[in-house]
């Protein structure tokens, strides 16, 4: 405890720092997936899909099961970190050139796959299949069948 108090004045500051670290790690993981040669609409969304739908532990930390984060959002500073992050993603994905409807469906589907992977409900094969389908949807593709 004394080591933590040396770096953080209280529990809330520690939690805010942890949240900021997780938010930053996800954003960095997505940005590492941006294809600089891809100038088509949906470039950021494709990076988002590739980052979320690979099973990377760094990314899955962001989507850890709810009990891990229980009680974290009990104070304004933590809520502010999450709201800022959510607003950043909403703004940047909206400006990515895809229709708002496509952004909504593809983004939430990618997040759902990531969450399912956290619970061990997706195999690498099913993640790869979902990833390919979602990538296709960013390029105007339709659902099969």
Task: Give the location of each predicted region.
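Helix-turn-helix
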Residues: 1-13
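Hydrophobic alpha-helical connector segments
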Residues: 17, 25-65
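An acidic intrinsically disordered interaction segment
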Residues: 26-34, 71-82
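Amphipathic alpha-helical segments within well-ordered protein domains
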Residues: 31, 49, 69-70, 90-94
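Short alpha-helical scaffolding segments that buttress acidic/His motifs in well-ordered protein cores
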Residues: 48-52, 65-70, 106-113
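Hydrophobic/aromatic-rich alpha-helical bundle segments in the mid-to-C-terminal region
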Residues: 59-61, 76-83, 87-145
């Amino acid at each position: 405890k004394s080591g933590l108090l040396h770096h953080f004045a209280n529990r809330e500051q520690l939690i805010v720092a942890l949240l900021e670290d997780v938010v930053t790690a996800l954003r960095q993981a997505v940005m590492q997936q941006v294809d600089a040669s891809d100038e088509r609409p949906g470039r950021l969304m494709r990076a988002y899909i590739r980052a979320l739908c690979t099973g990377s532990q760094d990314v899955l930390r962001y989507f850890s099961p709810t009990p891990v984060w229980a009680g974290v959002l009990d104070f304004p500073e933590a809520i502010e970190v999450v709201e800022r992050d959510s607003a950043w993603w909403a703004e940047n994905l909206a400006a990515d050139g895809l229709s708002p409807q496509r952004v909504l469906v593809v983004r939430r589907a990618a997040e759902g796959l990531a969450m399912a992977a956290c619970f061990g409900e997706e195999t690498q094969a099913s993640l790869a299949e979902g990833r390919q389908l979602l990538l296709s949807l960013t390029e105007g593709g339709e659902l099969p069948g």
